[in-house]
Regions:
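Extracellular loop and loop/strand-boundary signature of outer-membrane beta-barrel proteins
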Residues: 110-111, 166-169, 216-221, 280-288, ...
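Gram-negative outer-membrane beta-barrel transporters
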Residues: 363-365, 377, 435-436, 442, ...
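C-terminal beta-signal and adjacent terminal beta-strands/loops
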Residues: 104, 502, 555, 560-561, ...
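Periplasmic-side early beta-strands and strand-to-turn transitions of outer-membrane beta-barrels
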Residues: 154, 162-166, 172, 179, ...
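Outer-membrane beta-barrel signature, preferentially recognizing the C-terminal barrel domain
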Residues: 273-305, 416-422, 470-479, 483, ...
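Transmembrane beta-strands of outer-membrane beta-barrel pores
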Residues: 150, 169-175, 188-190, 199-203, ...
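Acidic, small-polar-rich N-terminal luminal/periplasmic segments of exported/outer-membrane proteins
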Residues: 12, 16-160, 262, 539
Length: 740
């Protein structure tokens, strides 16, 4: 995979807004192409923009990207879900240097493994491909692709420099956070290397709730202690000017400790029971959540090959381990006659581990047939992944000391799916065909994927699911695409096409660990699950002038065979139990319009040199076609506008974020987040050679508003805890970076 270059951390800021349509991207076609030559909607965020916008997490990253939102859990688990055009979770493929980030998995109230595994201080650029992308990226690219590209030694060693050292310190008020990073790079005649070390710590992210109660009525954020660190190292050997061997070792660790005050208090009275009926009081709850990711990769890039089969070639082999561990310590008591009795300590632990080995290669070949030019791209991907998940726990009677491994309805330990191994193998080919000296581009592509699942029995699975058989699964999927770009006039172009997306049946749905004989229910495997699929159509118009650039696109995506987990089905004969199974049942449709652009006012009038503007908007509408209801995951109409003034050494921008009231709700009575408009003020100052100061004031007006990704689906309009899910009020972030 060819990787785009990024600005060095201390590069001076250009005057005026960069024309995003001239930016070179890779993810959409697996070749380096300007956005205006790509038959898809693609956006890129580079290191300079991340620094200028004080980006600290994935929500900050997409703050000014309408059409992309980030889901989160306000009570405890934080950010973990990137949604593109209303589709998120494991239906969006998230990559770091071409390697998939761990799946998300959650069950119940105490287990939630997210996908927020990337430390953005190790990243130099992020590319977002919107819409189905399985023709080049395979399974899970149903809704789109988010590709993180990490830093390289060459990003810092400019103009023949042999060494680079950099330090960065920052703070943010919304969570009383502080962070720092150190970067070192070196270069010899053939060797170069890079080391990046990061650390951050803070507290809970504030909201605008003011109820500090230690019970379910609480609206203030639960107290948290957050800490994390990461390491990125790269060693590059260049035996010649046109090839490089690269060894990458990367790791990250995050820990969050939470006093879950919002879960405390007296349980609700069961309807129909007298007020004196026994109830439960939760006296304390403490969460300790820990996640790690470690990666080793070896890659080889050849820019020039004297071969009839390829002009360039890239390949890599890798291993990546991701692990989430979440522990919960809860103390509770029974309430009888108004008195607390039988104090009990409950200890729970959730583990979700994903280990992947993989290899990939891609080759490129340029050739011509008459006056028609071709760029052929072809290659393969192979991944073997092992998934392990377990929930464990015990209950301790603090009066008698008795210990039990049963916390109803579970008899621990349990697995919610068996230990599973998957193999994914895909081959792809794409031809970028250029007619009339590139005025018209036709881009057909196709990919064939083979997916195999092999689950394993073990004592924990068999003990929790007695008599439940497990099933293997094998599926083959073909994903075509056809795109086109027509530069029909100077500065103007049309683009569009068709793409098919798919998601292989998840290991956690083929075999369900959902059996409890005491309560009379069980689950059966479904070896006949079909892949989830999407058919996406898009048409767009671009203008790329000297002073103004703009892009308008419309899309229509049809999804079918969405998998519903734990669906109640007819019981087999002689089975006196309620039976559940995952099945393909849901169909959905999402359509929408997106607009983005920018203006360099200095090109319109020299007296306005340094002034620029940017704007973007996204509107989507989605329906669950199975029951003709609006899709809950669709964000309302959102937009951003920014006006900036840049000089050689400093710059300032006023940016606005706007959202319309969310009106399309699947059920009456749900909370409809009101519309909002908030403004941010950003500034940067290169106050000395190799030294830069960034500062931002966010939500200048201290407005109370709700981010769509934070609002739980079951939240009602009459709820007394609406303010628990509000975004932070006015807050400040700042950083200073020096390098030499």
């Amino acid at each position: 995979m060819a990787l785009p270059a990024a600005h060095a951390a201390d590069a001076p800021d250009a005057s005026g807004e960069v024309n995003e349509l001239n930016r070179v991207v890779v993810s959409a076609t697996r070749t380096e192409r300007a956005v205006q030559d790509v038959p898809a909607t693609v956006s890129a965020i580079d290191r300079e923009r991340m620094d200028n916008e004080l980006t600290r997490n994935i929500r900050d990253l997409f703050r000014y990207e309408p059409g992309i939102d980030v889901g989160g859990n306000r009570e405890r688990f934080g950010l973990g879900d990137i949604r593109i055009r209303g589709l998120g979770g494991n239906r969006v493929r998230v990559l770091i240097d071409g390697i998939s980030v761990s799946d998300g998995f959650s069950i119940g109230s105490f287990s939630n493994a997210g996908r927020n595994f990337v430390d953005l201080d190790t990243v130099k650029e992020v590319e977002i491909v919107r819409g189905p992308s399985s023709a080049l990226h395979g399974s899970d690219a149903l809704g789109g692709v988010v590709s993180f590209v990490t830093k390289d030694p060459a990003d810092y060693l400019k103009d023949g420099a042999k060494s680079y050292f950099g330090l960065k310190l920052g703070a943010e008020s919304q969570n009383e956070g502080i962070y720092g990073s150190a970067t070192a790079a070196f270069a010899g005649e053939r060797w170069s290397g890079l080391v990046v070390v990061n650390h951050h710590q803070g507290k809970e992210t504030e909201n605008q709730g003011d109820n500090d109660a230690h019970d379910g009525s609480r609206t203030r954020a639960n107290p948290q202690s957050v800490e994390g660190r990461s390491l990125l190292t790269k060693l590059v050997f260049a035996p010649s000017a046109n090839q490089r061997f690269r060894l990458t070792v990367e790791g990250s660790e995050d820990r969050t400790q939470t006093d879950v005050f919002s879960a405390l208090g007296l349980s609700a009275l069961t309807p129909g029971l007298p007020p004196t009926a026994p109830r439960t009081r939760v006296l304390s709850m403490y969460g300790n959540d820990h996640q790690t990711r470690a990666r080793v990769a070896f890659a080889h890039e050849i820019d020039s090959l004297d071969s009839a089969l390829a002009d360039s070639l890239t390949w890599q082999v890798y291993r990546q381990d991701s692990e989430t561990t979440q522990r919960t310590r809860e103390q509770r008591a029974s309430v009888v006659g108004g008195r607390d009795t039988s104090p009990t300590l409950r200890l729970r632990e959730f583990n979700f581990d994903q280990r992947v080995y993989g290899a990939e290669a891609a080759a490129h070949k340029d050739f011509a047939t008459g006056s028609v030019e071709h760029t052929l791209t072809y290659g393969f991907e192979y991944e073997q992944t092992e998934f392990r998940q377990k929930r464990d726990g015990r209950s301790v009677n603090l009066t008698t000391g008795a210990v039990s491994s049963t916390i109803s309805p579970d008899a621990f330990p349990v697995r919610d799916f068996p230990i599973s191994k998957t193999r994914n193998a895909g081959v792809f080919v794409q031809d970028e065909i250029r007619f009339a000296d590139g005025a018209f581009r036709l881009v057909p592509a196709v990919r064939v994927d083979r997916y195999e699942l092999k689950p394993q029995n073990d004592a924990i699975w068999n003990g929790d699911n007695p008599g439940v058989k497990i099933s293997d699964l094998s599926k083959t999927s073909v994903s075509p695409k056809l795109g086109a770009v027509w530069h029909f006039a100077q500065d103007w172009s049309l683009y569009g096409g068709y793409q098919r997306g798919f998601r292989a049946p998840p290991y956690s749905d083929v075999n369900l660990g959902f059996t409890n004989l005491q309560f009379g229910y069980t689950a059966i495997p479904n070896p006949n699950l079909k892949p989830e699929t999407s058919n996406g159509y898009e048409l767009g118009l671009r203008y790329s002038g000297k002073a103004v650039y703009a892009q308008l696109s419309g899309y229509y995506n049809d999804y079918k065979d969405f998998i519903e987990s734990n669906r109640q089905v007819s019981a087999p004969p002689q089975t006196p139990l309620i039976v559940f199974q995952s099945q393909n049942v849901d169909k959905a449709r999402i359509r929408g319009v997106e607009l983005r652009g920018g203006v360099d006012f200095g090109e319109l009038d020299p007296s306005l040199a340094g002034w620029s503007g940017r704007f973007a908007a996204a509107y989507s509408k989605g329906e669950d076609k199975s029951d003709d209801r609006p899709l809950e995951s669709i964000a309302p109409l959102t937009a951003t506008v920014g006006v900036a003034y840049d000089r050689e050494a400093w710059g300032v921008e006023l940016a606005g974020r706007f959202a319309r009231r969310k009106s399309d709700l699947p059920e009456a009575g749900r909370f409809a987040a009101p519309g909002y408009g908030v403004f941010d003020l950003l500034a940067h100052w290169n106050f000395a050679p190799g030294a830069k100061f960034n500062v931002g004031v966010f939500n200048l007006g201290d407005k109370k508003y709700w981010d769509n990704g934070d609002v739980p689906g079951a939240l009602t309009a009459s709820s007394a805890i609406l303010d628990r899910y509000t975004a932070p009020g006015r807050n400040v972030g700042a950083s200073v970076a020096v390098s030499w």
